[in-house]
């Protein structure tokens, strides 16, 4: 038994990948062998297609027409529409459209149900029979033939072995071997009968298998027609659906033809402005300058040239969206956006960026880059002029218009903080960008470098707008924005005449009285008096001019949070004279003596008053008794105290410091260093006491 199984495994192992088996290959010709190889792939194909096609059905499989239609999603949609248009006015356009849509969805659902029923009958069921009945029967008969052939071969090998054993027993002879010979002969006869029976079965199974192969080869074309019929059914379904949709659409358009021709719907069409090429936009509207460019420029010229951070600060998304819609639908009502110059600047940048081709054209991109790479200013300017002359006429006109405006904007850089460099940084990438090419990181790096060169090109165009684009320009080209007038710069002479002169009190000529020295209390000892007379270290003084002080005060004021003031209508008047120091504070009657230092109020901190760099004058020392001369030491004259001798100079110097900001401003020489009082010898103190 184990030998038979091992032999069977060997036969299966010898079966090639082509599907040929040694049991059946000897009975089949070359044509039938090829047909046999197509059995397994055909069975798998029919099974997979049937499974996936069954999943595409939307209705209930095997149900009748009415049940199938109720389960379709299109029928559910039709029911929802029928319930919805009952609440609407049947004479309204929406009610009529919804009613028509409900009817067409119901019709499409029935067409779909018919399509699925035909698909099941003509495609799904034949494919199921082919994959589950016909081809499995042929493959089953093939396996039976293989088993019979294997058993027949095994029986033949046993028969040959038994015949060989019977011949060897006859050659040996003997009485005892006669009985063995008879048993062997009977076994051989039995094996011959079994072999004849198996041979008959093999022949019968072989004939049936060959007939199945011939039948499959003749019906293989009809099996292929299943897939052709599938496409025909689908085409017929879509054709019927399209016919129904065309009929419904024609009827729906006829019903709404009067509504479409009403005055409300025949108003000025919603013209496309953003995202359209410049040439198409100009041809459709019959303009020389693009509508967004002219409208935004006039809005900014009206109110916005002195807005700080223009084109750099972003506007609100909702305001910008509403502005773009208004510009496309009703450009005459744009004056309401004058109060938001940042939204207007954002709309201009958005238009330039959404152009299919940049305003400075992609065809001249390399020429712009070559002109920007020139180091010599004259050569670079000449190259840029040459590239500008090769622009298309509509691009040149709009670029000239825009550069003239940006040059005017740069003239207000002291107020709006937008220099030509800042304007080029924020607008350059919107005027010119490299052509889109799919590449590696190296090309991306090159694009970033080119953006820097684009900024350089735009900056030079702004700085030399009068040279590259000579002649004056009228910004109101179309005349539809007549209500937007550019801001007129006020004349400085008229402003100075209208404003009254402001008198500034000059305190520099009035000398500040020198505080009188305060006498020390009598109870203070000599040592304490000596320590109190020592000069204290003064804080370092930083000399600032009145202009620097004013700038510092304005900077500190700018850093603090404060509500935005109303926008001025004219620039502030120019100061007629330089600022002078504030007037000296007058002491009220009954206050402390002038010698006592007073603290300044907080409102004066940060003004031109500064702390003196020279210490206050020391009080005069009380008269000391004459020292007794020591007998051992020579008599030495007592020098006068340097503090006492220098006191008048210090007083004068301090007064000059307060008036003019420092001792350097009085005489132009640094002050003489003050020597501290010298300590007296301990022996002399004791003798004096």
Curated annotation (Swiss-Prot):
InterPro entries noted in UniProt: AH/BAR_dom_sf, BAR_dom, RHG17/44/SH3BP1-like, Rho_GTPase_activation_prot, RhoGAP_dom
Pro residues bias locations: 565-575, 613-625, 670-680
Bias type Basic residues, positions: 1-11
Region feature Interaction with CD2AP, mapped onto this chain: 470-689
Biased composition (Low complexity): 576-594
Interaction with CGNL1 as annotated region, ranges: 1-275
Cellular component GO terms held in the UniProt record: adherens junction; bicellular tight junction; cell leading edge; cytosol; exocyst; lamellipodium; nucleus; phagocytic cup
Pfam family for this entry, one: BAR
PROSITE patterns the UniProt entry points to: BAR (PS51021), RHOGAP (PS50238)
Residue stretches making up the BAR domain: 17-262
SMART domains: BAR, RhoGAP
Region annotated Disordered, chain positions: 1-24, 507-689
GO BP term, pick one: filopodium assembly
Alphabetically ordered keywords of this record: Cell junction, Cell projection, Cytoplasm, GTPase activation, Nucleus, Phagocytosis, Phosphoprotein, SH3-binding, Tight junction
Modified residues (Phosphothreonine): 596
Locations listed in the record: Cell projection; Cell junction, Tight junction; Cell junction, Adherens junction; Cell projection, Phagocytic cup
Motif SH3-binding, residue range(s) on this chain: 611-620
Residues annotated with Phosphoserine modification: 241, 262, 539, 545, 586, 641
UniProt-annotated site: Arginine finger, residues: 312
Domain Rho-GAP, chain residue ranges per copy: 276-469
Description of its domains: The BAR domain mediates interaction with the exocyst components EXOC4 and EXOC8 and is required for the function in cell migration. It also mediates the interaction with PLXND1.
Function as written in the Swiss-Prot or TrEMBL entry: GTPase activating protein/GAP which specifically converts GTP-bound Rho-type GTPases including RAC1 and CDC42 in their inactive GDP-bound form. By specifically inactivating RAC1 at the leading edge of migrating cells, it regulates the spatiotemporal organization of cell protrusions which is important for proper cell migration. Also negatively regulates CDC42 in the process of actin remodeling and the formation of epithelial cell junctions. Through its GAP activity toward RAC1 and/or CDC42 plays a specific role in phagocytosis of large particles.
Name of the molecule in the record: SH3 domain-binding protein 1
């Amino acid at each position: 038994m184990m030998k038979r199984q091992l032999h069977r495994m060997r036969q299966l192992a010898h079966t090639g990948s082509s599907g040929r088996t040694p049991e059946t290959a000897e009975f089949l010709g070359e044509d039938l062998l090829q047909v046999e190889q197509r059995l397994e792939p055909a069975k798998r194909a029919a099974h997979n297609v049937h499974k996936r096609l069954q999943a595409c059905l939307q209705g209930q499989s095997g149900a009748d027409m009415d049940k199938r239609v109720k389960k379709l999603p299109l029928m559910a949609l039709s029911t929802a529409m029928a319930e919805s248009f009952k609440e609407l006015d049947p004479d309204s356009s929406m009610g009529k459209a919804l009613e028509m849509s409900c009817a067409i969805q119901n019709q499409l659902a029935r067409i779909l149900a018919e399509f699925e029923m035909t698909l099941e009958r003509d495609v799904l069921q034949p494919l199921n029979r082919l994959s589950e009945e016909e081809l499995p029967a042929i493959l089953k008969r093939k396996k039976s033939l293989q088993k019979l052939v294997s058993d027949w071969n095994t029986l033949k090998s046993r028969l040959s072995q038994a015949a060989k054993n019977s011949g060897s027993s006859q050659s040996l002879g003997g009485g005892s071997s006669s009985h063995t010979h008879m048993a062997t002969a009977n076994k051989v006869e039995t094996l011959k009968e079994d072999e004849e029976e198996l041979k008959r079965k093999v022949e019968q199974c072989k004939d049936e298998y060959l007939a199945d192969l011939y039948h499959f080869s003749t019906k293989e074309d009809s099996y292929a027609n299943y897939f052709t019929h599938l496409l025909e059914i689908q085409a017929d379904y879509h054709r019927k659906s399209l016919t129904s949709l065309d009929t419904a659409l024609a009827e729906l358009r006829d019903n709404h033809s009067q509504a479409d021709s009403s005055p409300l719907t025949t108003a000025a069409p919603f013209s496309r402005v953003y995202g359209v090429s410049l040439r198409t936009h100009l041809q459709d509207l019959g303009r020389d300058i693009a509508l967004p460019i002219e409208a935004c420029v006039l809005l900014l010229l009206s109110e916005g040239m002195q807005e700080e951070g223009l084109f750099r600060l972003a506007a609100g998304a909702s305001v910008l969206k509403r502005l773009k819609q208004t510009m496309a639908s009703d450009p005459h009502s744009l004056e309401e956006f004058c109060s938001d110059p940042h939204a207007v600047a954002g709309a201009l940048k958005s238009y330039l960026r959404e152009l299919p081709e940049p305003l400075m054209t992609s065809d001249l991109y390399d020429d712009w880059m070559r002109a920007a790479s020139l180091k010599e200013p004259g050569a670079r300017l000449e190259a840029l002029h040459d590239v500008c002359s090769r622009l298309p006429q509509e691009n040149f006109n709009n670029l000239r218009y825009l550069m003239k405006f940006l040059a005017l904007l740069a003239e207000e850089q002291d107020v709006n903080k937008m220099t030509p460099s800042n304007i080029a940084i924020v607008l350059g990438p919107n005027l010119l960008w490299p052509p889109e090419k799919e590449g590696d990181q190296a090309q991306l790096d090159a694009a970033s470098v080119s953006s820097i060169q684009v900024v350089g090109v735009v900056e030079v165009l702004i700085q030399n707008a009068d040279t590259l684009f000579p002649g004056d320009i009228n910004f109101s080209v179309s005349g539809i924005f007549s209500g937007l007038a550019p801001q007129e710069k006020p004349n400085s002479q008229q402003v100075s005449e209208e404003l009254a002169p402001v008198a500034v009190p000059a305190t520099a000529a009035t000398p500040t009285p020198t505080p009188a020295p305060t006498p020390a209390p009598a109870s203070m000892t000599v040592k304490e008096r000596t320590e109190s007379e020592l000069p204290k270290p003064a804080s370092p003084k930083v000399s600032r001019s009145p202009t620097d002080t004013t700038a510092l005060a304005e900077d500190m004021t700018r850093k603090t949070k404060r509500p935005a003031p109303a926008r001025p209508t004219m620039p502030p008047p120019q100061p007629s004279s330089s600022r002078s120091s504030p007037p000296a504070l007058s002491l009220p009657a009954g206050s402390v003596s002038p010698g006592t230092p007073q603290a300044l109020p907080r409102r004066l901190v940060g003004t031109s008053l500064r702390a003196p760099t020279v210490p206050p004058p020391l009080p005069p020392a009380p008269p000391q008794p004459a020292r007794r001369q020591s007998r051992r030491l020579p008599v030495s004259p007592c020098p006068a105290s340097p503090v006492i001798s220098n006191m008048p100079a210090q007083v004068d110097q301090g007064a000059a410091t307060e008036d003019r900001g420092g001792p350097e401003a009085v005489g132009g020489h640094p002050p003489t260093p003050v020597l501290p009082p010298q300590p007296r010898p301990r022996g002399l103190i004791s003798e004096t006491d």
